[in-house]
Structures are given as structure tokens and as C-alpha cells.
């Protein structure tokens, strides 16, 4: 009894609060028990003090302490009727009605009155959705920024096409807030790091020509998408086809009699997802002329770590300069598109797993690089890229995108790192041990020691089926030591295009889980959220709102968080949709199988019924014949049977049987039908009035015994068509027998 007495039960109604609000709203509309008047721009609003004080901190401070029976609160000029009317409806109905005309004023009134339980993100979303005029302002601002940003020293050219140049400039602009690049005259010359004046002059000339030639040709609609999320995706999901950002990269000489050494420099802070270096081997005539003068500047930059300055693992690589051969090619051709480019390969540096390995790997790579760069090179008299058309370029790039999208997976980190691997027993042995996972692109994927992570290592030069007019160009082939120039065989022609990797948003499979999760994690890494993306996805709606209130987040972080959650919801919805479709398909398959089995059973049943029906007809026919033989029927009985018999089976066989049984057939037939008043007619083949037909047949037939077989042959079809009338005949026979 003690347990039952101490037990307490609570009843909680889910509609009580809603009904109370509805009742209060009805009282407000009818001006019942309203004790406060709010004046907004001369317009009066009647309300209840308790409701206003509970919904707004401003009204709570104005109303509490007032003892007047009828209180009037006059709001300042900041509060307008258009902004206050939806708020008072929200206080009584918990519904806030917004439109393009009143969203700004309602937002100002909410901030001024300190209205509770209204999310600020709602206004940000609606402003972002309604106000389309901001896109034009962004275009003007971005145009102004592009003109001044070209003078910065982190030069990002594209040696393939003008659209690649536009993409690189857009990427550079979008990274301006989070990437701080050094100036060319202050930070690039530090300590023992040097840059030669000819190289700086060529770079400055390239930048000037870029700013003057491409200033009017920039397609601002393509560079300025309408929404910020598209801008963010536009700036982060494209791997730049040309960016020199390897950590502390140095250009070393490859000839023993070299007198000068060009060095790339480091020391600047930068953040780049992928560091890409293009190796240009065009304009061989210019290179040969430099060789005759005794100097052979290296067109490549091997990774070399400066002594005494080890880099931490999480440090980002600096932005460097391009190779000298590429700049000479640019100066001599005078074209931003760089028609002399022969090969593009992607090269980045893998993060070092141990601090002591920083001094061992660069020196080993440098020795192997110097050894491989001494190899023979074939001379090429013509540039194959000049014969290439823009259509072939686009086809090759689209094919590359299609192959790359199949390889990217969610298991790999969102910032994929392309790293050259060091050969152990030589380039040939390392090449034989590798496994090509994409035969056309020649992409080889190395297996990382960490479980669940895979990194792209080498993009080898491959045979492009759509570019068949490329001339073979000789260069040293070494896949394992970081040298990305290849010796082409006489039967093979290298494809010089770099693969542009799309990471999710550019692909049409937006509902796929792999691309969406990869893009979400990429944005999470870039915006630097205080919590991971998995937590954003797994939380419920209330917990998610509480989490946002606990942290002070910037608009960029809020956009990223909502984008991640939206993508996760879309992915879950797509998975559920696919599951429903699969369930429907399975149900349809089961129904089809069920209908097929039912059809087979019905066909078998029909065959069985038909066979049974044939047997039954035969049995009834035999039974009727037997009964008619045994019973001597009177003429009246025969007439009754003929009246109820069907047209398909008359009783003529009875007459024939009776005629056969008598010695004088003619007398028997005439005596049977003597009482019939039916006039003689033409003999029908089989039908009603069979008695008259039989009588006429008897009268016309000669009085011989040979007429019986002829009658039997004429009545044979009627005898075979025994149906339901046989059953009626049998029942009539039983009735006459009983009489």
C-alpha cells in the first residue's frame, strides 16, 4: 500500500498551450480582457500585458511596475506598423508571416523589441532568398578587386586555355580572406634564398600582360555566381591546373659546368588544398641556345628541405614561381594560353609522418632527380599543341573528369594530397609493382599505412584516344622519384592535358552520398568549424539549434553548417527514395511471379475441366442410348422429349434406334408419328421439328431395309453433338418412367 500511495502520475496535454494561445488571440480580436494599448505610427493595437511581457524584453521593462488600469505604450519611430503587426500575431499564434516587403522591417523590430523565440538564421535565409539586388553589387565589387589583385606576387597562370585562367583568378580571389601571400620584393629574399633578376623580370612581364590582356575578357557572370554557396563551391571544388605551392621548392642545375643556380623560395604562410606544378618541355630551340652558352636552367623544381628550418607537419606550403622554361615559352610565344605546353602533370608533396624524415627524403629525392635529369632527350622540331583544336581539348578534359569522378571516394580525406613516392629498387621495379586502377588515365593509387586512407600518387602521361595528332617528344621517364617527364615510345603518343578533378558539386550526381559527404567535409575543413561535420549531421533539430546558440559563429560558418546539414538531409532523403523504389520493384516482382503462378494453375485447371467435360459427354451419350434401347417409348413420350430437347442434339437417334429394332422400318416410323399434325417439310440437318423431318424421310425413302443405314449416316452429326440437352432428356426419361 505504501508504494501505491507514494506513486504520482502526471498528465501532460500536447494541445493545451496551443488552445490557450488560440483563446487569447480570439480575446484580442474581440477586445476582451485587453489591458494595454500599443501605439505604432498612430495606429492602435489592443493586447494583453502578460502576453507582451512574456514575449518581449522591451515590453517587460515597460509594463512591469505600471499600476494604471488602462495602459498605453507608444513605440518609437524605429518600430513600424509593417514590422510590428506580424510580431503581435506571432505572440498570439506562434506563426510569423514574412514577405519580401516586410522582412527587413520585421527584422529591425525583432532586434529593437527583443522578441523571444525567433531565430536570426530565418531572417538571414529570407534576406538571402528575397534580395536579388546583392548579386549586382557583388559583381561590381569583384570587378574592382580583380584589377588590383593581379599585382600580387602569387601568380597563378594556366598554360592550357583562357577558361582555366579565369578559374585560377576566381580561386585566387575567393581565397584572399584566408590565404596571406608574400610580396615579391620583401618576403621572397630571406636568408640564403635567392631569385635571379631575369626570372623576376619574366614573371613581372607575365603579370602585366595578364592584367592588360585579360581585364576586359573576364566573364563576370561566370566568376560571380548568384549565391554564396555556389561561390564557395566554385572556389574550392576545382583543382587548379597550375599552382606552384610546394613547400620550399628549389630549382637545381643539371649540368656540371653550370654557373648560376635558380632557387625557389619559402617562408611564407599559405593554405592550398592541392599543389600543382606544370612541367613545360616546349620551345626546344630556346633551350638548345641556352645550352650552347654554357648555362642550362633546370625546368623542374625538386623538393628540397632547407637545412636548420624543419617544417611542422601542419604547416602549409608557400606559393612559388614557375619554371624558367615555361616563362621563356611565354615570352617567346606572347600568348597567355601557352601553345608550347607539351605535358601537364600533377605534383604535390605528401605530409611527413616523422620529424626526422624531413632531412632524409628531400636529399634522396634530389640525388635521384639529378641522376634522372641527365638522361638523353630527343629533339622536337614542331609543337604538337599548336595543331590541337579546342574541341579536342574539351573532349579530353570531359573524359578526364568522368574517369576521376569514379575514383574519388569518401574514404579519402577531403583535401586529397598527391605525393610522389621514393623508389626503393629502381624505377622499373617500382613501375612493375604498381597497379593501374584507371587504364586510360594511368592513375595509380598508393596504399597508405593508415587504415581507411588512400592518397593519389602519380598522374602518368597516358594515351589519349581523342588526341591522335601529337608528336612524340623525348624526355626521361622516372615514375617513382618525382620526375614527371616521360619517354614516349614510337607507337604511343602522350596526352599532355592535366586532369581537372571535380569534387562533388560539379557532378550531376548530387544525390550520391560519396560526393556530398566529401564536399561537406571539405567545407568543414576550410571554414574551421568548432565541431565536426558528423556531429552536425547526427543531431536532432532541437539539439542542433541549442548547439548553434552555444557557439558564436560567423555568417560563413553558419552557411557552411546549414549547407552540411542540408546535404545530409538530401542524402538521407535520396537513400529513402531509393529504398522505396527498390521495395516497389520487389513488390512488383513478387506480384508478377504470383500472377504467373496463378495463370499456370488456371491453365492446368482449364485443361482438366475440358478433359472431364469430354468424358462426361461421352458417358451421358452412352447412357442415353442404353436407356432408350431398354425402354419402349410411346409417341407421346417422344413428342415430349422432342419439345424439351435442344436444337444441337435432337432425338432423331432414338427414332433411328427404334426403326432398327423393328423388322418393318416404314410401318414403325408411320405408326410413331401418326398422331402428329405437323405438315411435312424439307428435312433440316439438325434442329427442332425433328419428328416431322424424320417422317418425311420415311415417306420419301423406299420401303426397303437399306434406308436405315442411310438415315444413320445422316443423323450421325446430331448424335455426336450431345450436350446439356442429353441431361434434360435423361431427366424426362426418368419422369416418364415414374408415370
From Swiss-Prot:
Main location (coarse class): nucleus
Superkingdom assignment: Eukaryota
Annotated family: Belongs to the bZIP family. CNC subfamily.
Transmembrane residue ranges: none
Leucine-zipper: region residues: 585-592
Keywords for the protein's UniProt record, in alphabetical order: Activator, DNA-binding, Nucleus, Phosphoprotein, Repressor, Transcription, Transcription regulation, Ubl conjugation
Chain intervals with Low complexity compositional bias: 699-708
Localization, UniProt: Nucleus
Tissue expression remark: Ubiquitous.
Signal peptide: none
UniProt cross-references to InterPro entries, sorted A to Z: BTB/POZ_dom, bZIP, bZIP_BACH, bZIP_Maf, bZIP_sf, SKP1/BTB/POZ_sf, TF_DNA-bd_sf, ZnFinger_BTB_dom_contain
Function of the protein: Transcriptional regulator that acts as a repressor or activator, depending on the context. Binds to NF-E2 DNA binding sites. Plays important roles in coordinating transcription activation and repression by MAFK. Together with MAF, represses the transcription of genes under the control of the NFE2L2 oxidative stress pathway.
Identification of the protein by name: Transcription regulator protein BACH1
Record note on modification: Ubiquitinated by the SCF(FBXL17) complex or by the by the SCF(FBXO22) complex, leading to its degradation by the proteasome. Under oxidative stress, reactive oxygen species covalently modify cysteine residues on the bZIP domain of BACH1 and release it from chromatin. If the BTB domain of BACH1 remains intact, its beta1-alpha6 degron is recognized by FBXO22, promoting its ubiquitination and degradation.
Ranges for region Disordered: 287-321, 344-391, 679-708
Amino acid at each position: 500500500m505504501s508504494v501505491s500511495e507514494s506513486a504520482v502520475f502526471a498528465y501532460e496535454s500536447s494541445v493545451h498551450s496551443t488552445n490557450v494561445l488560440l483563446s487569447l488571440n480570439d480575446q484580442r480580436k474581440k477586445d476582451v480582457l485587453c489591458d494595454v494599448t500599443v501605439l505604432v505610427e498612430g495606429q492602435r493595437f489592443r493586447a494583453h500585458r502578460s502576453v507582451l511581457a512574456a514575449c518581449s524584453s522591451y515590453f517587460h521593462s515597460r509594463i512591469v511596475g505600471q499600476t494604471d488600469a488602462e495602459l498605453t505604450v507608444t513605440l518609437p519611430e524605429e518600430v513600424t506598423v509593417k514590422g510590428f503587426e506580424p510580431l503581435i500575431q506571432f505572440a498570439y499564434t506562434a506563426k510569423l508571416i514574412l514577405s519580401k516587403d516586410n522582412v527587413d522591417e520585421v527584422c529591425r523590430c525583432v532586434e529593437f523589441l527583443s522578441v523571444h523565440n525567433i531565430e536570426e538564421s530565418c531572417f538571414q535565409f529570407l534576406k538571402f532568398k528575397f534580395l536579388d539586388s546583392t548579386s549586382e553589387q557583388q559583381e561590381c565589387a569583384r570587378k574592382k578587386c580583380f584589377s588590383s589583385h593581379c599585382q600580387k606576387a602569387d601568380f597563378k597562370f594556366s598554360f592550357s586555355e583562357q577558361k582555366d585562367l579565369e578559374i585560377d583568378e576566381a580561386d585566387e580571389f575567393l581565397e584572399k580572406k584566408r590565404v596571406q601571400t608574400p610580396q615579391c620584393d620583401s618576403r621572397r629574399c630571406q636568408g640564403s634564398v635567392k631569385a635571379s633578376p631575369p626570372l623576376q623580370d619574366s614573371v613581372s612581364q607575365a603579370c602585366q600582360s595578364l592584367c592588360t590582356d585579360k581585364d576586359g575578357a573576364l566573364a563576370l557572370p561566370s566568376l560571380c555566381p548568384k549565391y554564396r554557396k555556389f561561390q564557395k563551391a566554385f572556389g574550392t571544388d576545382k583543382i587548379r591546373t597550375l599552382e606552384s605551392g610546394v613547400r620550399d621548392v628549389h630549382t637545381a642545375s643539371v649540368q656540371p659546368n653550370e654557373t648560376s643556380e635558380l632557387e625557389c623560395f619559402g617562408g611564407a604562410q599559405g593554405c592550398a588544398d592541392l599543389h600543382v606544378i606544370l612541367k613545360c618541355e616546349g620551345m626546344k630551340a630556346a633551350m638548345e641556345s641556352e645550352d650552347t652558352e654554357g648555362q642550362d636552367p633546370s625546368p623542374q623544381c625538386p623538393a628540397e628541405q632547407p637545412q636548420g628550418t624543419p617544417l611542422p607537419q601542419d604547416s602549409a606550403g608557400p606559393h612559388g614561381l614557375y619554371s624558367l622554361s615555361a616563362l621563356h615559352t611565354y615570352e617567346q610565344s606572347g600568348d597567355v594560353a601557352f601553345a608550347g605546353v607539351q605535358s601537364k602533370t600533377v605534383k604535390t608533396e605528401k605530409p611527413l609522418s616523422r620529424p626526422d624524415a624531413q632531412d632524409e627524403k628531400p636529399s634522396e629525392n634530389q640525388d635521384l632527380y639529378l641522376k634522372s635529369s641527365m638522361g638523353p632527350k630527343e629533339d622536337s622540331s614542331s609543337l604538337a599543341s599548336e595543331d590541337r583544336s579546342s574541341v579536342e581539348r574539351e573532349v579530353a578534359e570531359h573524359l578526364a573528369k568522368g574517369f576521376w569522378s569514379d575514383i574519388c571516394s569518401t574514404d579519402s580525406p577531403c583535401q586529397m594530397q598527391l605525393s610522389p613516392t621514393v623508389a626503393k629498387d629502381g624505377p622499373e621495379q617500382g613501375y612493375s609493382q604498381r597497379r593501374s586502377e584507371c587504364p586510360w588515365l594511368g592513375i595509380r593509387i598508393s596504399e597508405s599505412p593508415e587504415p581507411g586512407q588512400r592518397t593519389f600518387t602519380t598522374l602518368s602521361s597516358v594515351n589519349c584516344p581523342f588526341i591522335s595528332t601529337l608528336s612524340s617528344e623525348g624526355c626521361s621517364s622516372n615514375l617513382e622519384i618525382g620526375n614527371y617527364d616521360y619517354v614516349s615510345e614510337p607507337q604511343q603518343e602522350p596526352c599532355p592535358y592535366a586532369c581537372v578533378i571535380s569534387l562533388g558539386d560539379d557532378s550531376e550526381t548530387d544525390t550520391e552520398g560519396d560526393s556530398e559527404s566529401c564536399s561537406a567535409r571539405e567545407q568543414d575543413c576550410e571554414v574551421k568549424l568548432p565541431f565536426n561535420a558528423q556531429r552536425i549531421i547526427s543531431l536532432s533539430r532541437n539539439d542542433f539549434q541549442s548547439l548553434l546558440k552555444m557557439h558564436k559563429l560567423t555568417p560563413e560558418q553558419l552557411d557552411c553548417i546549414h549547407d552540411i546539414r542540408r546535404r545530409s538531409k538530401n542524402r538521407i532523403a535520396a537513400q529513402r527514395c531509393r529504398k522505396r523504389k527498390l521495395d516497389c520493384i520487389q513488390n512488383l516482382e513478387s506480384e508478377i511471379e504470383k500472377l504467373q503462378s496463378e495463370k499456370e494453375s488456371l491453365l492446368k485447371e482449364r485443361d482438366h475441366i475440358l478433359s472431364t467435360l469430354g468424358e462426361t459427354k461421352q458417358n451421358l451419350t452412352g447412357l442415353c442410348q442404353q436407356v432408350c434401347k431398354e425402354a419402349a417409348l410411346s409417341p407421346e413420350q417422344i413428342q415430349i422429349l422432342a419439345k424439351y430437347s435442344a436444337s444441337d442434339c435432337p432425338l432423331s437417334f432414338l427414332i433411328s434406334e427404334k426403326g432398327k429394332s423393328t423388322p418393318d422400318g416404314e410401318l414403325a416410323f408411320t405408326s410413331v408419328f401418326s398422331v402428329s399434325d405437323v405438315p411435312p417439310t424439307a428435312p433440316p440437318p439438325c434442329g427442332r421439328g425433328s419428328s416431322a423431318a424424320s417422317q418425311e424421310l420415311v415417306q420419301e425413302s423406299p420401303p426397303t431395309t437399306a434406308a436405315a443405314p442411310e438415315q444413320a449416316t445422316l443423323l450421325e452429326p446430331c448424335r455426336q453433338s450431345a450436350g446439356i440437352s442429353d441431361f434434360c432428356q435423361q431427366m424426362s426419361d426418368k419422369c416418364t418412367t415414374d408415370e
